Amino acid sequence: MQVFVPYPSPIDVARAMSNDKLRLRKQILECDQILKAISGESKAWKNHPIVKMFLKHSSWLLFYRDCLQYFQEGDIAWAQDRSDYADELYRPPFLTDDFCDQHKRRLYTKSPTLYPQFASYGTSEENWYMVDGQIVKYINGKRI
């Protein structure tokens, strides 16, 4: 499971992914699964590092999901109208330049034709999660 955050702003992420309809749908679904695990509505994924990563940041994740949803539906104005809210929203501390750059590499690796703007970041097979203040790296579902 992966939530891509190539930018700290959910609006900027939605804008970057707006041409990748399949990825948008998948991200929305994965956000829903994470939010259900956080709320206790679902036991699935409750021990996954991404659930632990967003445990204290569910409001940010919900806004991220909503931005993707509205961009997918073509209602770009929804997110733009809430840009002030996005700026005030508590940003998870793990959304550093290095962390976001790694997500740019992952998106480019997955689909270079849809993410040519990330070509200069190179490629990577690693998924990064922040757990207990530490970056945890995985490749193909295995911690490295």
Task: Cite the ranges covered by each PLM segment.
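Expand to "…catalyze enediolate/carbanion chemistry for C-C bond making/breaking, isomerization
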Residues: 1-144
